[in-house]
């Protein structure tokens, strides 16, 4: 074996270097500026430590802070390790478990000592101070490879039972990498890491909160303390992020949902939503809007059972792939005379549906279908249940019971591209009605999947070609292909909405599926008189009503457009002499189809204005003695200064226009 290897750089130039040379040494040979700026290396596209020796011919790219995505991933990973070291320094006996980088920071899960108990938010400044001390010490971050059994013994000796358990599940004889911070602290980690803690900016991170978590996300396991932080490359990025967090807090749908009396959640129905009258108005408006859209697009609405036999889920493939996220119950009447229900060993099992697709196939299979019957578009506002971990639940954004605007299009091979293109046009119109821009992504085959490579090639090409024909595969629409992100049965197109403060939310999807029709034996009679499998297009636009409403609340800061607002107008009196006129005005507004309430309380008008503004009522119609005599109203519109005086009839006409859903307006 030669002592020299060939290293090819991004510009195409190549260098012969000694085997064992590090990327850091190559950076230094190129120039002192690059040596200082280089943070890590990409070896044949894979992110690696800059101090890790090169052992074979390779393509090398040096990562600097200009490569922001890679640099942020490295920095956040390192902040997580520095956090763990700081906690163990300050609180001896605390066990470390797991701590990854996240989309805007990092977290680490700890098992505190029984004497200390769970960590508290007020301890975060102390931990931050210790983290800055570790960063200032510029401790080298050194990779070391251990034998699995030796590492398990080391973790047990150090009292790190969680790490020992994790290591014990790795294959016997496997070498495991650990990273040392200096010579006095280590963690088990695949890496990569920066060369030293001093590469981090001590003013570019902040610990944000503490929460509970469970070992491996399972509530049956030990409860842990999770410390969250946000980490960036410099203090300017951190400051900008904190401003975004402050703005996001103002828009938090959980707080606004309470203030506007839209919904609530409670432990007795963990992960399920109690919709209040105001919130359910929003729900019903969205439901009516979507029904009009799908009716016009040629869909037929159906309703399917909540509970189905486990054998159906086994046949569809969901039981093997999705069982741990399903709510399962025995198909047997419990023996109520005993202390608790008894389930026999041979009991049959039922499951609450986590998705609607198998049931729609069963509808398709009822009665013989001809090629002339296709495409058949079945739509359902389908209520589903998924057993999400407690720690993953988040307001309306992540729930256990949710309703999808779900549809499945059964079509022939020659109809796929047109159906996908039509769906793209439908989704575009709907998202624009709500004021959203979006990016569209193609999620490609995952490592674990059903079906042949040829089938996946065909399905991916069909989705790709439909987007190209629709003119959406462009930079304007954020077109991107995402390897490994598809469902286990099909590739999918994803719609990522951008809200008022620049955050993105993945909502709509369409998937081209040849697996499920085959597994559930769906067929139609072709023009040739033979049986053929339909292709099944799974699609949704809102995703789920719960999550979409949460997104709308935050996007509009609770200030829904008039057509969606639970209460569209309030008629408020200045003096009691105007009470009768206010009642009559309210009645006329209600008769015109405007959701209106009257406020006749003996309160100052400024108090009423403030209260209804906080409730996000879009229009306040103020009436006093003069308005009653002249048949006028003084209209105040939420978010605008001043007021307009106009005849009541004119005000009703204006509000009727604003209360008209966008799809019912002349386009």
From Swiss-Prot:
Gene3D superfamilies named in the record: 3.10.20.30, 3.30.54.20, Anticodon-binding domain, Bira Bifunctional Protein, Domain 2, Threonyl-trna Synthetase, Chain A, domain 2
Single GO cellular component annotation? cytosol
Region Catalytic, residue ranges: 252-561
What domain of life is recorded for the organism? Bacteria
Q: Which InterPro entries match?
A: aa-tRNA-synt_IIb (IPR002314), aa-tRNA-synth_II (IPR006195), aa-tRNA-synth_II/BPL/LPL (IPR045864), Anticodon-bd (IPR004154), Anticodon-bd_dom_sf (IPR036621), Beta-grasp_dom_sf (IPR012675), TGS (IPR004095), TGS-like (IPR012676)
SUPFAM superfamilies annotated for this entry? Answer: Class II aaRS ABD-related, Class II aaRS and biotin synthetases, TGS-like, ThrRS/AlaRS common domain
TGS domain sequence ranges? 3-64
**Which EC number(s) does the record attach to this protein?**
6.1.1.3
Identify the cofactor(s). Answer: Zn(2+)
**Single GO term (MF):** tRNA binding
For this protein, what reaction is catalysed?
tRNA(Thr) + L-threonine + ATP = L-threonyl-tRNA(Thr) + AMP + diphosphate + H(+)
Query: GO terms for biological process?
Result: threonyl-tRNA aminoacylation
Q: How is the cofactor bound?
A: Binds 1 zinc ion per subunit.
Compartments in which it is found: Cytoplasm
Q: Which UniProt keywords apply?
A: Aminoacyl-tRNA synthetase, ATP-binding, Cytoplasm, Ligase, Metal-binding, Nucleotide-binding, Protein biosynthesis, RNA-binding, tRNA-binding, Zinc
Q: How does it assemble?
A: Homodimer.
Q: Could you tell me which PANTHER family the record lists for this protein?
A: THREONINE--TRNA LIGASE, CHLOROPLASTIC_MITOCHONDRIAL 2, THREONINE-TRNA LIGASE
Role played: Catalyzes the attachment of threonine to tRNA(Thr) in a two-step reaction: L-threonine is first activated by ATP to form Thr-AMP and then transferred to the acceptor end of tRNA(Thr). Also edits incorrectly charged L-seryl-tRNA(Thr).
Protein family membership: Belongs to the class-II aminoacyl-tRNA synthetase family.
Instruction: From the Swiss-Prot or TrEMBL record, give the protein name.
Output: Threonine--tRNA ligase
Give the encoding gene's name.
thrS
């Amino acid at each position: 074996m030669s002592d020299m290897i060939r290293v090819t750089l991004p510009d195409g130039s190549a260098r012969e270097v000694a085997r064992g040379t590090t990327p850091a040494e190559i950076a230094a040979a190129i120039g002192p500026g690059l040596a200082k700026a280089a943070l890590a290396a990409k070896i044949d596209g894979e992110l690696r430590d800059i101090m890790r020796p090169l052992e074979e011919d390779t393509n090398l790219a040096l990562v600097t802070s200009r490569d922001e995505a890679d640099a942020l991933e490295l920095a956040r990973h390192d902040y997580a390790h520095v956090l763990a070291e700081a906690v163990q320094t300050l609180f001896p006996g605390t066990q470390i478990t797991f701590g990854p980088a996240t989309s805007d920071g990092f977290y680490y899960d700890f098992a505190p000592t029984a004497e200390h108990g769970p960590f508290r938010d007020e301890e975060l400044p102390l931990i931050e101070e210790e983290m800055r001390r570790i960063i200032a010490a510029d401790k080298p971050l050194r990779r070391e490879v251990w034998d699995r059994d030796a590492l398990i013994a080391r973790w047990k000796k150090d009292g790190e039972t969680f790490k020992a358990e994790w290591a014990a599940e790795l294959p016997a004889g496997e070498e495991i990498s650990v990273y040392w911070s200096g010579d006095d602290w280590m963690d088990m980690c695949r890496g990569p890491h920066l060369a030293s803690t001093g590469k981090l900016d001590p003013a570019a991170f902040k610990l944000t909160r503490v929460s509970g978590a469970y070992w491996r996300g399972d509530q049956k396991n030990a409860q842990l303390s999770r410390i969250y932080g946000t980490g960036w490359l410099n203090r300017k990025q951190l400051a900008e992020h904190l401003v975004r967090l402050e703005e996001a807090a103002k828009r938090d749908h959980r707080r606004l949902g309470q203030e506007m009396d839209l919904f609530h959640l409670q432990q007795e129905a963990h992960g399920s939503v109690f919709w209040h009258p105001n919130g359910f108005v929003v729900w019903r408006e969205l439901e009516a809007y979507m029904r009009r859209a799908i009716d016009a697009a040629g869909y037929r609405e159906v309703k399917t059972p909540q509970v189905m036999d486990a054998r159906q889920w086994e046949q569809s493939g969901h039981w093997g792939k999705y069982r741990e996220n399903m709510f399962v119950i025995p198909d047997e009447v419990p023996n109520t005379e005993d202390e608790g229900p008894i389930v026999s060993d041979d009991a049959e099992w039922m499951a609450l549906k986590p998705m609607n697709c198998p049931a729609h196939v069963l509808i398709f299979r009822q009665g013989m279908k001809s090629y002339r019957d296709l495409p058949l578009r079945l739509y359902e506002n389908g209520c589903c249940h998924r057993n999400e971990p407690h720690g993953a639940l988040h307001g309306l954004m992540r729930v256990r019971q949710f309703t999808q605007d779900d549809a499945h299009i059964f079509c022939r091979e020659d109809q796929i591209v047109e159906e996908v293109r039509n769906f793209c046009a439908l989704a575009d119109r709907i998202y624009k009605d709500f004021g959203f821009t979006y990016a569209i992504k193609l999620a490609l085959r995952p490592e674990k999947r059903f079906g042949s490579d040829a089938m996946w090639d065909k399905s991916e090409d069909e989705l790709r070609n439909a987007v190209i024909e629709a003119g959406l595969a462009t930079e304007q629409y954020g077109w991107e292909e995402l390897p490994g992100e598809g469902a286990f049965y099909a590739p999918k197109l994803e719609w990522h909405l951008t809200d008022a403060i620049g955050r993105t939310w993945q909502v709509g999807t369409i998937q081209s599926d040849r697996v499920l029709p085959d597994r559930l034996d769906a067929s139609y009679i072709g023009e040739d008189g033979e049986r053929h499998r339909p292709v099944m297009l799974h699609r949704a636009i809102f995703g789920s009503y719960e999550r979409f409403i949460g997104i709308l609340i935050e996007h509009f800061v609770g200030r829904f457009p008039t057509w969606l607002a639970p209460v569209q107008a309030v008629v408020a009196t200045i003096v009691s002499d105007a009470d009768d006129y206010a009642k009559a005005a309210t009645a006329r507004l209600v008769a015109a189809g405007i959701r209106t309430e009257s406020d006749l309380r003996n309160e100052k008008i400024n108090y009423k204005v403030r209260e209804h503004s906080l409730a996000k009522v879009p229009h306040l119609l103020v009436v006093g003695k003069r308005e009653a005599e002249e048949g006028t109203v003084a209209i105040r519109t939420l978010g605008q200064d001043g007021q307009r005086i106009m005849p009541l009839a004119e005000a009703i006409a204006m509000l009727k226009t604003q209360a008209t859903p966008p799809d019912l307006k002349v386009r």
